[in-house]
């Protein structure tokens, strides 16, 4: 369980690095999210997509270009909480977030709160893995630690 949790967190960090570098390299806004029928949705599960995002934001339209899609493990879920409360994370052409400082909680399966990881991102687009209290997460999710 620990290995799966570490792998999921590392995969998310790698995907965020990729998205930020694409925004910087191509000088275009790039969005990361879980897409359902072309719209960014919560919670992030099943798959994540990185795409060049022109208006309207948070949706993959004809003018947008999908850059990468990764599949998540079957029971994995990524919770994204940000200042602007959007279902997506958007990197600007300068590599920062669109005023979306926040955090991700990665869970490999329901009830696996003790193996969850937290990744914090700031407005400049930099992120770090942080410590957190599993009991606080359990209260947020309405689950018992396990």
Regions flagged by a language model, labelled:
Residues 1-21, 25, 29-146:
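N-terminal helix-rich module
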């Amino acid at each position: 369980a620990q290995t799966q949790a570490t792998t999921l967190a590392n995969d998310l960090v790698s995907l965020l690095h990729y998205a930020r570098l694409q925004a910087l390299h191509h000088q275009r806004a790039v969005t990361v999210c879980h897409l359902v029928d072309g719209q960014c949705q919560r919670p992030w599960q099943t798959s994540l997509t990185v795409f060049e995002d022109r208006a309207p934001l948070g949706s993959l339209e004809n003018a947008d270009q999908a850059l990468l899609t990764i599949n998540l493990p079957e029971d994995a879920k990524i919770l994204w909480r940000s200042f602007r409360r959007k279902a997506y994370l958007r990197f600007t052409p300068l590599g920062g977030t669109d005023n979306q400082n926040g955090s991700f909680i990665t869970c490999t399966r329901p009830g696996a709160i003790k193996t969850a990881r937290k990744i914090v991102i700031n407005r400049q687009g930099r992120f770090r893995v942080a410590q957190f209290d599993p009991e606080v997460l359990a209260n947020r999710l309405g689950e018992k630690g396990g």
